[in-house]
Amino acid sequence: MSIDDRKIRILQAIINDYIRTGDPVGSRTIAKNYNLGIGSATIRNEMADLEDMGYLEQPHASAGRIPSSKGYRLYVDQLMDNQMLTVEEDLRIKQYIIDSAMLEVDKIVKQTSALLSELTKLTCVIETPSVKRSFIKSIQLIKVDDHNLVSVFLTDTGVIKNHIMKLNNRVPEVETLTRINEVINNRLVNLSIQEINLEVINNLKKDLGAYEEIFNALLPILYETLNSADSTEVFMEGTTNIFNYPEYNDIDKAKEMLSLLNDKEALMELFNPQDNITVSIGDENYKPQARDCSIISAEYSFKDRPIGKIGLIGPRRINYSKVIMIMSEVIKELNNILSNPK
């Protein structure tokens, strides 16, 4: 059985109504509230066909129907109408741009997560940029006291790593320390973290020559940076948002969701953005705890280079068009803030 234009219009009306109200939808509701030009009996028959085709489900003994994951998939891919931002949403995003202008990258990322959870009323999870994907912009050794330096690594994506370097000998004078910084930067700047290999390290050792203690103090920092290149920090905002949806009044569903939200690494594995924004619905999520969820995920970028993932998680019954519009606008502004810092 193929899905014809009339069935599509009925399915679209059912999903729009269910997203708005959260109540199972009956044929009389569609006939009364949507000008489809057909009667309740015909709609009822078409709804039975849509259920047989897997686009609708009948919860419990309810006379109404709700969309299945298959129904939502067709809706997201073909049927939903585009929505615009409200004036309030637009103003809130503009304020976010102002607030983020002078912040460090990690704080911008955390603020982005808070904004998305606020505007979408969903749970937002975002990872900080992976150092592995970054290039070294500068390294500075700065005197703390007579026997301590702090090394400051800055990547092109704005990630900053600080480490204390303890020396047995006195910290070199300012002019000498300036030359040492120049040597280190000449060797390492514009390399990606992945490109710092044994050959690069040996050449740096030769370049530093007489400053062996500086090299020996710097070496473990380089190794630590390499070993932690894949590590990212994960921020989560709006954890309780999802429990405002009646779908999670069921204690077993609520427990499953809490189990998923408490495992950030497992949650990040569910974020598999392809091109632009990716929506995975219900059974499309391979983890059992996420089978009743929808996940909207995307990558954010630095100068068109993806550097991190971001995702929203909620029930299957969400306003997909609105959520996708908000996410698209916020990520566009995040990419611009990161790529064009003030």
Curated annotation (Swiss-Prot):
<dbReference type="InterPro" id="IPR029016">
    <property type="entry name" value="GAF-like_dom_sf"/>
</dbReference>
<protein>
    <recommendedName>
        <fullName>Heat-inducible transcription repressor HrcA</fullName>
    </recommendedName>
</protein>
<dbReference type="InterPro" id="IPR021153">
    <property type="entry name" value="HrcA_C"/>
</dbReference>
<keyword id="KW-0805">Transcription regulation</keyword>
<comment type="similarity">
    <text>Belongs to the HrcA family.</text>
</comment>
<dbReference type="Pfam" id="PF03444">
    <property type="entry name" value="HrcA_DNA-bdg"/>
</dbReference>
<dbReference type="Pfam" id="PF01628">
    <property type="entry name" value="HrcA"/>
</dbReference>
<dbReference type="InterPro" id="IPR036388">
    <property type="entry name" value="WH-like_DNA-bd_sf"/>
</dbReference>
<keyword id="KW-0804">Transcription</keyword>
<keyword id="KW-0346">Stress response</keyword>
<dbReference type="InterPro" id="IPR023120">
    <property type="entry name" value="WHTH_transcript_rep_HrcA_IDD"/>
</dbReference>
<dbReference type="GO" id="GO:0003677">
    <property type="term" value="F:DNA binding"/>
</dbReference>
<dbReference type="InterPro" id="IPR002571">
    <property type="entry name" value="HrcA"/>
</dbReference>
<dbReference type="GO" id="GO:0045892">
    <property type="term" value="P:negative regulation of DNA-templated transcription"/>
</dbReference>
<dbReference type="InterPro" id="IPR005104">
    <property type="entry name" value="WHTH_HrcA_DNA-bd"/>
</dbReference>
<keyword id="KW-0678">Repressor</keyword>
<comment type="function">
    <text>Negative regulator of class I heat shock genes (grpE-dnaK-dnaJ and groELS operons). Prevents heat-shock induction of these operons.</text>
</comment>
<dbReference type="InterPro" id="IPR036390">
    <property type="entry name" value="WH_DNA-bd_sf"/>
</dbReference>
